[in-house]
């Protein structure tokens, strides 16, 4: 709903002031104030001041972050490290659209949109880090494991053109839950990723470096696939040469580096793709799973 549309189509020979000061007028038949406009109300013909004052939005977010880490130096070249964090988010959004707004947008008694979303993300990892040099060689390496656990819960209600039982009463109980309304509910959906990873950089005379990484992830979203047990593996390898460390460079060139690398990337799939589920739509209408795998 763009208030500018009503301004663009407003006749240039008419005065906007009465519709600005009295964007709503009392309707005796409905016993309430309704939108005041010079012509029939449509999606493109609405009083812009009505839209500004009678389309109310509220968007709130509550968030809690906490983290902790600890490390222990075993030797001068070996360190053990553990980290963990939690991220909790609670989003709430609602929109109140008053009765007499365009019938293509809201029902006769108005429209109410309510959305709430909670997510809790837990992450933890353990790593052993190595940093050692000898003669012309150096080695930086790490090996570890991590876990990411995400839990979500969501509810979205939209009366759409199904309208409300009572005009301009914006509560969930007042939504007419007919088939033209919209309901989307997610009950405590959970997703977990367990990982094992390793990385190493071998250097020679501070000029030639070989980088190797490897990671394997096991995702709960792959529970109903052939990759349930083996997850997915993605490595990378790179070789770089810092030229000034090996040869003298011309005065016009301050630095030179050559690098070649190869990598493979991996990712899991969204929730419920490997095991789709049915649900109940607005009005109590069952929506069974009709997408393979059943």
What is each of the regions a protein language model found here?
Residues 3-5, 11-15:
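Betabetaalpha-Me/HNH-type nuclease active-site subdomain
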Residues 13-29:
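Core domains of carbohydrate- and sulfate-ester-processing enzymes
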Residues 1, 8, 36-97, 107-294:
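Extracellular/periplasmic, surface-exposed regions of secreted and cell-surface proteins
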């Amino acid at each position: 709903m763009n208030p500018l549309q009503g301004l663009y189509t407003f006749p240039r020979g008419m005065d906007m002031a009465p519709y600005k000061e009295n964007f709503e007028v009392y309707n005796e038949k409905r016993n309430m104030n309704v939108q005041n406009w010079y012509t029939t109300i449509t999606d493109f013909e609405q009083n812009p001041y009505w839209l500004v004052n009678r389309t109310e939005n509220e968007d709130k977010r509550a968030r809690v972050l906490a983290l902790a880490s600890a490390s222990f130096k075993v030797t001068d070249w070996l360190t053990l490290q553990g980290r963990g964090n939690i991220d909790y988010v609670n989003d709430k959004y609602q929109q109140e659209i008053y009765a007499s707004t365009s019938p293509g947008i809201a029902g006769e008694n108005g429209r109410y949109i309510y959305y709430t979303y909670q997510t809790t993300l837990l992450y933890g990892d353990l790593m052993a880090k190595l940093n050692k040099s000898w003669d012309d060689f150096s080695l930086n390496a790490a090996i570890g494991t991590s876990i990411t656990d995400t839990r979500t819960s969501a509810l979205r209600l939209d009366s759409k053109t199904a309208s409300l039982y009572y005009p301009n009463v914006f509560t969930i109980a007042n939504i007419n839950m007919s088939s033209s309304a919209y309901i989307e509910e997610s009950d405590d959906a959970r997703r977990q990723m367990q990982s094992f990873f390793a990385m190493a950089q071998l250097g020679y005379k501070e000029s030639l470096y070989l980088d190797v990484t490897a990671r394997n992830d096991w995702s709960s979203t792959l529970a109903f696939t052939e990759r349930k047990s083996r997850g997915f593996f993605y490595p990378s390898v790179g070789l770089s040469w810092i030229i000034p460390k090996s040869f003298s460079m011309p005065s016009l060139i301050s630095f030179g580096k050559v690098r070649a690398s190869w990598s493979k990337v991996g990712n899991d799939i969204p929730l419920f793709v490997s095991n789709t589920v049915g649900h109940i739509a607005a009005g109590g209408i069952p929506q069974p799973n009709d997408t393979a795998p059943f």
